[in-house]
Regions:
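N-terminal organellar transit peptides
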Residues: 1-105, 111-218
């Protein structure tokens, strides 16, 4: 079960097997199809959950893709780095699909998907920006915290530059203020590779994602 989906009703789905019907929550059933979700703010709890799910799916089959659906406003930089790092660590490729929004740390995770397998739906919104230093306390502690925020921002700039093919100077300039992008703009920027169009007009990205093993899109 996706414990990160808080304060909501999680649907139950009946799956017919040779041993009879079995009830699953919807997220557990989709996990069997190698589909995982980032559907809330990025915090330690959701990061730990996604890391565990990705590692489990790698152990199940290191040759098959994992499909990570993203609808998140972002959140904690460290938690985002944890998800990003495990995506790069596992042997199987992680395809990323943005639905709704992928902002801040979630945009970094989106961009960190396997090359050629980073997607967004047509009305998705992506936003990149530098880290926030909102903190209180003794001046020296605030100075230490600010240095750490700047270091984390520099690392995020390096990651975005690596996955978009842009220079660190360009990325640093672009994130000085919140930069919102449409799916088309995110593709031009290099954060995603393709836009998944509606099913009635099946796109090459749709076919590629389906061929990669996502039965939900077939």
């Amino acid at each position: 079960m996706n414990l990160g989906i808080r304060h909501s009703v999680i649907p139950t789905v009946l799956d017919q097997t040779s041993r009879g019907d079995r009830a699953y929550d919807i997220f557990s059933l989709l996990l069997r199809e190698r589909i995982v979700f980032l559907g809330q703010e990025v915090d330690d709890q959701i990061a730990n959950l996604l890391v565990a799910e990705i590692l489990y799916l790698e152990a199940e089959d290191p040759e098959k893709d994992i499909h990570l659906y993203i609808n998140s406003p972002g959140g904690l930089g460290y938690a985002g780095m944890a998800i990003y790092d495990v995506m790069q660590h596992v042997r199987c490729e992680v395809s990323t699909i943005c639905v709704g929004m992928g902002m801040s740390a979630a945009a970094m995770i989106l961009a960190g998907g396997a090359a050629g397998k980073r997607f967004a739906l047509p009305n998705a919104k992506i936003m990149i920006h530098e880290g926030s230093a909102g903190t209180r306390g003794a001046p020296r502690d605030m100075e230490i915290h600010l240095r750490e925020v700047l270091a984390t921002t520099r690392r995020m700039v390096d990651i975005l530059a690596h996955h978009t093919g842009r220079s660190t100077e360009d990325v640093s300039r672009d994130i000085e203020r919140d930069r919102y992008m449409t799916a088309d703009e995110a593709k031009d920027y290099g954060l995603i590779d393709e836009i998944i169009m509606p099913r009635r007009g099946v796109s090459a990205a749709h076919l590629e994602l389906a061929a990669a093993g996502s039965s939900v899109l077939k």
